[in-house]
Regions:
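Conserved active-site segments centered on acidic
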Residues: 1-71, 141-145
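Phosphate-binding/catalytic loops
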Residues: 74, 80-145
Length: 145
């Protein structure tokens, strides 16, 4: 919960502010594993966000909770593995809709690559571009429904 999901959270918050609907939304990110609990976003994530004028973003990695499934209309994840994990965690009574953010990728790339082990900032830029494209399409959908 320090690379892709935080990047998507920052982008989505930024887009909501641009569209002047930020106050109507709660945007957050969480992980299902405790590898980075309590840590800030990966430095390369913050560098790429800053390159795109998103500089007011802060976050502390946390685990998704059962409560999240009852307080969130949508829970978006990054790849098939994360979707499977979330589907297994989701309480039967929850009305949250689970999707991969990539389901909204107009270029059809349904999984968003984890750049954490990459040694180039360019991979983070590619993830940013895909997340931005997907967040815009998701917002177009969500604001209509």
């Amino acid at each position: 919960n320090i690379c892709r999901s935080t990047m998507a959270e920052a982008i989505l918050s930024h887009l909501l502010t641009e569209r002047k609907v930020r106050e109507k939304w709660k945007v957050d990110s969480a992980g299902h594993g405790d590898w980075h609990l309590g840590k800030p976003p990966e430095e390369r994530t913050l560098q790429v966000l800053a390159r795109h004028s998103i500089t007011d973003y802060t976050h502390t990695a946390r685990l998704i909770t059962e409560e999240d499934f009852f307080t969130s209309d949508y829970i978006l994840c990054m790849d098939d593995y994360n979707l499977e994990e979330l589907e297994a965690m989701k309480p039967v009574e929850s009305q949250s809709v689970l999707w991969k953010l990539g389901d909204f990728d107009l270029k059809g790339a349904r999984n968003i690559f984890d750049p954490y082990y990459s040694n180039t900032i360019e991979i983070y830029e590619k993830v940013y571009t895909q997340c931005y494209r997907c967040c815009e399409a998701f917002l177009d959908y969500a604001l209509k429904n």
